[in-house]
Amino acid sequence: MVVGPISNLRDDALKDDTLNHIRKEYLESKKQISNLLSQETNTNEFSRKPYPNSSPIRKFDHFANERPTTIDAKLREQLRTGASDVAIEQSLRTNSDESRNQMIYDDMKVMKRIIDGQQESIRELRRALEQERYMNSELQRKYNEMERRFDRLEWFINSHDKFQAYQDIRSNTTKKDFSDPIFNNGLKRRWDEYPIRSFEPDTNINRNNRIFSNYDDSTTRLMQITDPHYRSVG
C-alpha cells in the first residue's frame, strides 16, 4: 500500500466527509431540540400561573442560582448560541485522528506482511541458488574426471598403437633377415659378400687347396673326412 501524498489526500477526504456528516447530524439535532424547547417555552408561558403566597428569592441564597430552571436556561442558551461547537469539533477531531492513526497502523501491518513475504522469497531464492551452485560444482568435478579418463585412454591407445607398430616392424625385419635368402632386391647381404666354407662342395669358386700339416688336429681330420676333395688330396 502506498503511503504518501495520495494517502494523505484520501485521509483528508475521509476526514472532511466524516466531519461534514457529523456536523450535519449535529445541526439537525440542534434544530429539533430548539424547536422542542421553543414549543415547551410557549406552552409553559400559556399554562403558568402565579403563586401569590410564594416568598421572594433571597439574594444571598447561592443554591437559588443553581435551580433546575436556571440550569435548563443555560442549556437552552448553549444550544441556541452553539457554544459547545468547539468541544464537539475537538471531539470529532480526536476521533478523526484516532481513525487516521488506526488506518496508518493497518497500512503498516500490511506493509510488514509484504516485506516478510519478500524476505521469505529472497531466502527461498538463496537456497535455490546454493543448491544450483552445488550441482554445478558436482557437474564440473565429474566433467574433469571424465576428461582425465579420456586422456588416459587416449594415451593408452597411442601407446598400444606405437607398440603394435614396433612389433610389426620387428617381426617384418626378423622375417626378412632370417627367413629370406635374398635381400635388397636380389643383392647379397653385406656379410655374405665373401664365400664361406660349407659342407657342400662349391664348384663355382676355385679355391687353393691347402694342407695344414702343422695342425693335424681333429678339425682338420673332420674336414678331410667330410670333403671329398680333401679326402683325395690326403
UniProtKB/Swiss-Prot annotation:
It holds the Pfam family Spc29. GO terms for molecular function: structural constituent of cytoskeleton. Keywords: Cytoplasm, Cytoskeleton, Nucleus. Transmembrane segments: none annotated. It is found in: Nucleus; Cytoplasm, Cytoskeleton, Microtubule organizing center, Spindle pole body. One of its GO terms (cellular component) is nucleus. Signal peptide: none annotated. Residues 38-57 are annotated as: Disordered. InterPro entries: Spc29. GO terms for biological process: spindle pole body duplication. It comes from the Eukaryota. Belongs to the SPC29 family. Component of the spindle pole body (SPB) required for the proper execution of spindle pole body (SPB) duplication. Links the central plaque component SPC42 to the inner plaque component SPC110. This is Spindle pole component 29. It comes from Candida glabrata (strain ATCC 2001 / BCRC 20586 / JCM 3761 / NBRC 0622 / NRRL Y-65 / CBS 138) (Yeast). The lineage of its organism: Eukaryota, Fungi, Dikarya, Ascomycota, Saccharomycotina. The gene is SPC29.
